[in-house]
Swiss-Prot record:
Gene expressing this chain: tpm
HAMAP family the record matches: Thiopur_methtran
Assigned keywords, A-Z: Cytoplasm, Methyltransferase, S-adenosyl-L-methionine, Transferase
Protein name: Thiopurine S-methyltransferase
Principal location class: cytoplasm
Locations listed in the record: Cytoplasm
Residues that coordinate or bind S-adenosyl-L-methionine: 10, 45, 66, 127
A Pfam match: TPMT
GO CC annotation terms, alphabetical: cytoplasm
UniProt record similarity statement: Belongs to the class I-like SAM-binding methyltransferase superfamily. TPMT family.
Coiled-coil portions: none
EC number(s) recorded for this UniProt protein: 2.1.1.67
Length: 217
């Protein structure tokens, strides 16, 4: 999963993808999933996103996985500051696990995370995972995500720009590919599509799209 690439990005602090406020789409539309506030939300490839703090503030439980220890250390420092959370840590199956009753954080390769380790989740919040992966990995990512989560409902944000205008990441994933990746397991609803400030993002004519995915079975 391009370990060296992402480790280097974090070591060099080249994290322009990190947002310093919670995702506006998350804040405005997450209630479309119709979840109880005690629901457990999975955040794959989480980085140190402030979206996790927002989810916790709403009363949700969170489980996240991130490859970079640097990112997770920063995330934990922020959570300790914001919520006075103290974590217990353990290690199993190549993954470091930080546990608190309201949040679990795993450090390591997403593909090493098992269904048993993840536990039951009610929904998946994917703002930056799918679009961080090149096309030769995305199908495997989606399949593993479905397997370990039991096809939990998804709040998925994709990103699209003109072909050839940027190499990625973030990678451009269009509506046709979203359907190819998810249609077998999910009913797919396009909820919101918006243009993105090109000066702040990669690629020509960038736009973000919010999808709600609901399991067919």
């Amino acid at each position: 999963m391009q370990h060296e690439f992402w480790h280097q990005r974090w070591q060099e602090n080249r994290i322009g993808f990190h947002q310093f406020t919670p995702s506006p789409l998350l804040v405005d539309y997450f209630n479309e999933l119709g979840l109880k506030t005690s629901a457990r939300i999975f955040v794959p490839l989480s980085g140190k996103t402030l979206d996790i703090s927002w989810l916790l503030q709403q009363g949700y439980h969170v489980v996240a996985i991130e490859l970079s220890q640097i990112a997770v250390t920063s995330l934990i420092e922020q959570l300790v500051e914001d919520f006075d959370i103290q974590f217990e840590s353990s290690e199993k199956n190549n993954l470091i696990h930080y546990h608190h009753p309201q949040i679990d954080i795993f450090v390591g390769d997403f593909f090493d995370l098992s269904k048993e380790q993840l536990g039951q989740v009610d929904a998946i919040f994917d703002r930056a995972a799918l679009i961080a992966l090149p096309d030769d990995i995305r199908q495997d990512y989606v399949q593993h995500l479905i397997e370990i989560s039991g096809a939990a409902s998804q709040f998925l944000i994709s990103y699209q720009y003109d072909a050839g205008s940027h190499e990625g990441p973030p990678f451009s994933v269009n509506a046709e590919e979203i359907k190819q990746l998810y249609a077998e397991a999910y009913d797919i609803r396009l909820l919101k599509e918006q243009l993105v400030d090109a000066s702040q993002n990669k690629g020509n004519h960038p736009k973000s799209t919010l999808w709600i995915l609901t399991a067919k079975f």
